[in-house]
From Swiss-Prot:
PANTHER family: MAGNESIUM DECHELATASE SGRL, CHLOROPLASTIC, PROTEIN STAY-GREEN 1, CHLOROPLASTIC-RELATED. It holds the Pfam family Staygreen. Promotes chlorophyll degradation in leaves. May be involved in LHCI proteins degradation, regulating the balance between LHCI and LHCII. Belongs to the staygreen family. Induction: Down-regulated by dark-induced senescence. Circadian-regulation with a strong expression during the transition from dark to light. Strongly expressed in leaves, stems and panicles, and at lower levels in roots and seeds. It comes from the Eukaryota. This is Protein STAY-GREEN LIKE, chloroplastic.
Length: 258
């Protein structure tokens, strides 16, 4: 008689994120719906789609809503609390336990901060000729941590899903800059996804004007995310018979607990 399901692990109070730690909020919602707070891993190949869909639903849930009350802004000494212009860079960090956001505004991105793969970095750059300024955002999908490579697809999706929240934090936290230079809201947003372990996720995307990119309901990005979700769902059917292997189960757990 085949084993239908095996409870393998209790989820932690606050899991590390697949990217930016935003998946921890989804994990909390999933735990609140589970009576025992455990994840069932099916050993039956016929039930693999259900398992993978549950895993995807946890990480690919709705975007996190921006709450200005949870945002703390820290200005470097050279900027003070005013819009002192450029160069200008941002580092956004997230706390698992409180869901608080911290936006650090500085001249440049410190090299040691780039090693924190769950943070998001952004900087203003002058474009060629008369195109004005553009905001370049950097997300580290995989490479710094071997375990991140096993969950690269999920990390890429979570970064994409939560990027409007990041941009809203920048616009709100650096409000004086945008008050003095409102044209920056029309600046293009270029998103650099960095992945040294998976070339598929090592890519550059143009998200359009900042005003639109910060809107989670933007039609273009919503359509793109739906396409990515469908691609992952199709991948589920192709991998149906692989879920009984220890490697597949291990990868799923890493995606949940990173």
């Amino acid at each position: 008689m085949p084993i239908e399901a095996v409870a393998v692990a209790s989820l932690p109070m606050a899991s590390r994120s697949a990217a930016l730690c935003f998946s921890s909020a989804a994990a909390a919602r999933s735990r609140s719906r589970s009576r025992h707070g455990r994840m069932a891993v099916s050993c039956d190949a016929g039930a693999s789609d259900l398992l993978y869909s549950s895993l995807a639903a946890k990480l690919l849930g709705p975007p996190t809503s921006f709450d200005a009350g949870k945002l703390t802004v820290e200005f470097a000494h050279s900027h003070g609390n005013s819009s002192s212009g450029f160069p200008r860079a941002y580092t956004l960090t997230h706390c698992d336990f409180t869901a608080n956001l911290t936006l650090a505004v500085s001249d440049t991105i410190a090299a040691d901060r780039r090693l924190r793969a769950d943070d998001v970095f952004a900087e203003w750059k002058q474009q060629q000729q008369q195109e004005g300024m553009a905001l370049h955002v950097h997300c580290f999908v995989s490479g710094a941590n071997l375990l991140h490579g096993l969950a690269a697809g999920f990390r890429y999706y979570v970064f994409s899903k939560e990027l409007p929240l990041v941009l809203k934090a920048v616009v709100h936290g650096d409000a004086l800059l945008f008050a003095e230079q409102p044209e920056l809201l029309e600046a293009k947003v270029w998103v650099h996804f960095h992945s040294s372990s998976n070339a598929k996720y090592n890519r550059l995307e143009c998200w359009g004007p900042l005003r639109e990119a910060a809107n989670a309901e933007t039609t273009h990005k919503r359509h793109a995310l739906e396409q990515l979700h469908n691609a992952i769902t199709k991948g589920t059917r192709r991998r149906r018979r692989k879920w009984s292997s220890p490697d597949a189960i291990f990868s799923a757990l890493l995606a949940l607990l990173l």
